[in-house]
Amino acid sequence: MTNNELVYPTDPLKIALIGTGGRARGQYCPIFKFLQAWVEVVAVCDPVRKNCDQAAEMLNVTAYYDIHQLVKDKPMEAALVVTPVPSHHSISVYLSSHGIHNMCETTWCNTLGQARQMIETAKDNKVIVRVAENFFRFSIDRFAQILRDSDYLGSIQRIFSYNDHTGYHNNSRWIAFAQSHPLWVQSIEHSMPTISFYSSPQRFHRNENFRARYFGFNQNLLVVDSASNIKGFLGRQSRPGHTEWQGESGTLLYRPETAELRYCSENNQQSQYDLPGKGGGRADRVYPVVKEIGEDGQWLRTYCQTDDTLIEYLNPYRLDGYREKSIGYSCAIADHISDFCLSVRGLRQSEFDEQDALMSLMMEIGAQESALNQGERIQLPVVGETEAEAKTYQALKQQYCVDPMDIEAMLDISYPKP
C-alpha cells in the first residue's frame, strides 16, 4: 500500500501571514523554513505591533499593521489567516474581493451566511478559499484512512469518540474518513454545576456542558461523537479521550496510553449452521499500532504489523531537525499549507475544499439546532433559517456592536487575547 508522493510547484506561492499572535509565532513561523518549496512568506500583518514586529523579525519580512495597506501594496498572491474566528469572514471576503487567495484557521467562520459569502466572493473573483484544518491529518486519522482502504476489518460502519474534540475539528475528521458529507445529525446537550475556576486567563468556569452528536452518512456509517471536558479538569478523561473505528471483523482502538488493532480471526467467526458453542466473536488477534519517531523527534510513520500484512501510513512531511513539542502537529500544518499551495497552482484537487469547510460548519449548526429541539433529527445540508444560527448572529452583533456581515466594520475591530 502506498501513500501519495509529495508534489512540488514550479515556483513557491508568495503568501502573507495575517495574524501574529501566539499560535502564529509558536506553530507557524518556525516551520516556514521547511516549506520553502511550496510557500514564500513575504509579509506579516497584525495591528498589535509588538507581535507583528517579532514575527517579521523571525521571518525577515516586512511588517504591516493595517490590512488595507497590505492589500494596497499586495506583495503576496495569497494569505494565511491566523486570527480569532469572528474576524475570519471579513478578512476572507476582503482578500478575495481583491483577488487574493486565502486560507483561514479553524473554525472557518461563525455562521452559514458568512461561509456562503466567503465561497461566493471567492468564486466571483476566481480565487481559492480554504480552511486550515489539520485534525484529520494527525497520525491516528491517517492510519484509520489507510485501514479503511485496506479492507482489513471489512466495512467500518461505526465510529465512537468520547472526549476528543466535538465541534468543527471532529466534524472535519468524519467527513475526511467517510469521503462524503453526512445526511443528518441528532444531538443532545446536558449541563451540570461544578466548582468555579479559571482554566486560562480568558476562560472562567462554574459549570460543565456535555454534548452528544450522532451523524448519519451514506453506506450506513454512524458516528457517535460526545465530550464534556476535553482538557481533563475535575479529574475527567482528557483528550484524546477514547475513539473506536468499528469494522465487520474488528476494531481500531485509540486512547492516550495505547493504539491497537483488534481482529476477530476466522477461528472465531461462525455461521448459523455451525455447531453452537462458546468463544465466537472475540477479538483473538490484538496488534499494536505504532507511531514511529525518528532520533530528531520527527514522526516517521504509523503502522501495524499483523500476522499476514503490514498496514502503514508514511509521513511525507519530515521537518528534519525541528523537534516539536507536540509530535506530528507541525507535520499536519505543513500538510494543509502545501495542499493550499498546490490547489492555488492547479496541481492538485484539495483534500478538503470549501464545500467540505461549509459542511463542517453545517454539522455544528445542525447539532446545535437539534439540541435546541430536544434531539430532533436535522437533515443535512442545512437549508433555510435556523434558531441556532440566529442566536449566533445576535450574540456576535451584541458583542461587537456592529453587523457581523459588515465587512469594513468587522475589519476595524481588533481581537487581541490576554
Where in this protein do the model-derived segments appear?
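N-terminal Rossmann-like dinucleotide-binding module
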Residues: M1-L59
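Beta-loop-alpha module in the N-terminal Rossmann-like domain of NAD(P)-dependent dehydrogenases
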Residues: V61-A122
